[in-house]
């Protein structure tokens, strides 16, 4: 733009009677100081005092109403664990637990013998039997005492004549067998435990037709053991309800 002015206007004309003058285009003074060192009139240098005095004075008004609550901020980080709370009340009573294992044997008692308590009697199993012989037997066979009077626990079987143990312990057995004689022979009756003779008895026919063979035992039995009376020759009397021949037993105490 400056180059264009230099080419088109080579000379500037100055006018007399004015404080402004023109110089050659391109000089610094024309561009930077067109008024020739004189100050240009200014209309904004002096403020208007009347205008400033007419402006109103602002006074602080009363406090306004509280604004509406703002929205909830973001969730903060977890706090530190609090102190333990107070101990709560006891809970309800629980169900009974399972029965514990037996404890060790107690210390021996005093020298004086004490009486057997009623609790001891109640703990002994109820096992006892008593039966008579109705049918006659002879030779070598198991006597089947089929006239049963007592059979607590049902451990005696009249169809086989055998007592079968189900509770281990000490047992007592006794038997009385009436011999049927008259021909000069003798009779043997054995008490057996599992095919082993544990007691024997003999009745002989000398001057009378009848004689007894009797015996008793105390045995320790295990579950499954069998006890019975077996003839080992001769004849056993039977055939009525008088129970001349009998077999009985009971438990003394369990293991």
Swiss-Prot record:
GO CC terms of this entry? collagen trimer; extracellular region; glutamatergic synapse; hippocampal mossy fiber to CA3 synapse; synaptic cleft
Signal sequence span is 1-20
- Which keywords accompany this UniProt record? Collagen, Secreted, Signal
Enumerate composition-biased segments (Pro residues): 75-89
SUPFAM superfamilies documented for this protein? TNF-like
> Its quaternary structure?
Forms homooligomers. Interacts with ADGRB3. Forms heterooligomers with C1QL2 and C1QL4, when proteins are coexpressed; this interaction does not occur after secretion.
Which tissues does it occur in?
Highly expressed in brain and white adipose tissue. In gonadal fat pad, expressed at lower levels in adipocytes than in the stromal vascular fraction (VSP), which contains preadipocytes, fibroblasts, endothelial cells and occasional immune cells. Expression exhibits sexually dimorphism, with higher levels in females than in males (at protein level). Tends to be up-regulated in adipose tissue from obese males, but not females. Expressed in glial cells.
Q: Where is the Collagen-like domain?
A: 61-111
User: What would changing residue 28 to A do, according to UniProt?
Assistant: Does not affect heterooligomerization with C1QL4
What InterPro entries does this protein map onto?
C1q_dom (IPR001073), Cerebellin_Synaptic_Org (IPR050822), Collagen (IPR008160), Tumour_necrosis_fac-like_dom (IPR008983)
Cite the C1q domain residue spans from the record. 122-255
Tell me the function of this protein. May regulate the number of excitatory synapses that are formed on hippocampus neurons. Has no effect on inhibitory synapses. Plays a role in glucose homeostasis. Via AMPK signaling pathway, stimulates glucose uptake in adipocytes, myotubes and hepatocytes and enhances insulin-stimulated glucose uptake. In a hepatoma cell line, reduces the expression of gluconeogenic enzymes G6PC1 and PCK1 and hence decreases de novo glucose production.
The molecule here is called: Complement C1q-like protein 3
Region annotated Disordered sits at 39-109
Pfam annotation, one family: Collagen
User: What induces it, per record?
Assistant: In adipocytes, up-regulated by rosiglitazone, an insulin-sensitizing drug.
Q: Where in the cell is it found?
A: Secreted
The GO molecular function terms of this record are: identical protein binding
């Amino acid at each position: 733009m400056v180059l264009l002015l230099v080419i088109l206007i080579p000379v500037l004309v100055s006018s007399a009677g004015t404080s402004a003058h023109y110089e050659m285009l391109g000089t610094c003074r024309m561009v930077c100081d067109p008024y020739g060192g004189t100050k240009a009139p200014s209309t904004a240098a002096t403020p208007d005092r009347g205008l400033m005095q007419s402006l109103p004075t602002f006074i602080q008004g009363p406090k306004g109403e509280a604004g509406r609550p703002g929205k909830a901020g973001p969730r903060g980080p977890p706090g530190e664990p609090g102190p333990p709370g107070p101990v709560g009340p006891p809970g309800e009573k629980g169900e009974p637990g399972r029965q514990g294992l037996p404890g060790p044997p107690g210390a021996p008692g005093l020298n004086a013998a004490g009486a057997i308590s009623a609790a001891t009697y109640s703990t002994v199993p109820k096992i006892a039997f008593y039966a008579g012989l109705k049918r006659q037997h002879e030779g070598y066979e198991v006597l089947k005492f089929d006239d049963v009077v007592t059979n607590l626990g049902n451990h005696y079987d009249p169809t086989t004549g055998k007592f079968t143990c189900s509770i281990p312990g000490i047992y007592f057995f006794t038997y009385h067998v009436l011999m049927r004689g008259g021909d000069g022979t003798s009779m043997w009756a054995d008490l057996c435990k599992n095919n082993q003779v544990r007691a024997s008895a003999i009745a002989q026919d000398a001057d009378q037709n009848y004689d007894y063979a009797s015996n008793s035992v105390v045995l320790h039995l295990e579950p499954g053991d069998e006890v019975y009376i077996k003839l080992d020759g001769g004849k056993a009397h039977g055939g009525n309800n008088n129970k001349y021949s009998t077999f009985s037993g009971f438990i003394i105490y369990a293991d």
